[in-house]
Structure formats: structure tokens, C-alpha cells
């Protein structure tokens, strides 16, 4: 990422709004975080709010009708699961058949990789759509759990959570030119997780993926 930022300062200035590489900052309110279990006996038990924030970089195509979009961002996510199967769950032995409720609070250092296509500019405004993937490295995992009359909060769950999260990234929105080299960026995005969030050897469950819906808000310079 350091190479990307350094290289961006050395690019010739041409293309859309007079530059090949656009850098910016973003903050994405995440209004849906859902842990999605793929087997019976485990249910979604609520969706949490979250936020993404960090650096954006658009490497412009030569015709300025699109870009390779990447960046570096911190992702915060939280969601809950209800384990009804007595043979599954992190505290299945202690729960002795009782339903177990878990709330995972996750943090990732994430790199999005996507192609962003753009419409023609009209009065400083243009539409965009993107399709790609993302890779996230786990940097924080805390857990709240309860079963029967027992409960505990903010347990360190780094060793019980898989260290990598990957998935499909899609989004759409618009850009509006505020000044010669300042563009307002906005839209909506969806992240469909492919990887398993919970370690199966500890949780004795099948795949549990993380899906997210977020608003895209940022400024390019």
C-alpha cells in the first residue's frame, strides 16, 4: 500500500479531472452486518451496525471511463448467532443442551480490488458501478455469549476466529465534482463473504459467512 501511495505521486497528470491516479478518504456506515450460517441447528440472531474507513485509490483507465479501484481500510462488523443444536457451538459442553447465543465483534484490515466503470460526466456529475473482490486480515475479535443463566462479554476470540475473510464486492453510486481536483463520492455497496468466519474445530459447525450492506461516502482529491 505504501508503494501505491508513493507511486501515485509520480504519475503524469492527465485523464478524468486531469489525473491518472486519484486518492481519497472514505467512511462507510454499514447498516447491515449478518453472519450467515449454512447448516441446520444454527440461526441468525440479529444484525449489527458497523463502519469502514480508510484510503481509496482509483487507477484510471486511459479513456477515463473506468478505473481499477483499490485502497486500504479498517472494517468493523458485529452480528449474532443462535446455536440450537446441542452438538455445536463454542461452549457446547458447558451449555449441556441449552441454546447458546453468541455475538461476534470483528475488525479487519481490508484491501478491496475491483473494476469501476463510469458514465460520461454531465454538469460535474457521473454515475459509477463496480464489481470485484476484497481480502481482509483479522486484527480484532471479541465475543459475547450466553446460555441458560450464564453470560459473559468481551471475551478475546482471536484464536476462535479465522484470520482471513474474502468475498464478492459490488456497488453503485455517483460522483460530483466539487472543485477541479476534489470529487464527492457516494453510493451503496454489498459484500458477500465466501470464507468461513468461525473455526470449525472449535465451534463444530459448518461454514458461517459474513454479509454486509453499506453506504459509500468519501472524497477524492
Where are the regions that the model predicts?
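Outer-envelope beta-barrel architecture signal
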Residues: 17-23, 64-68, 109, 123-129, ...
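Extracellular/periplasm-exposed beta-strand and loop segments of Gram-negative cell-envelope proteins
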Residues: 33-48, 77-107, 137-165, 196-212
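Residues on the lipid-exposed face of transmembrane beta-strands in outer-membrane beta-barrel proteins
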Residues: 25-29, 51-59, 72-74, 111-117, ...
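Cleavable N-terminal export/targeting peptides
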Residues: 1-19
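Short glycine/proline- and aromatic-enriched beta-strand/turn motifs that initiate or cap beta-hairpins
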Residues: 13-60, 220
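Early exported N-terminus immediately downstream of N-terminal targeting peptides
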Residues: 65, 70-80
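Predominantly the C-terminal beta-signal and adjacent terminal strand-loop region
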Residues: 14, 77, 165-170, 175-221
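Outer-membrane beta-barrel transmembrane strands
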Residues: 104-111, 117-120, 126
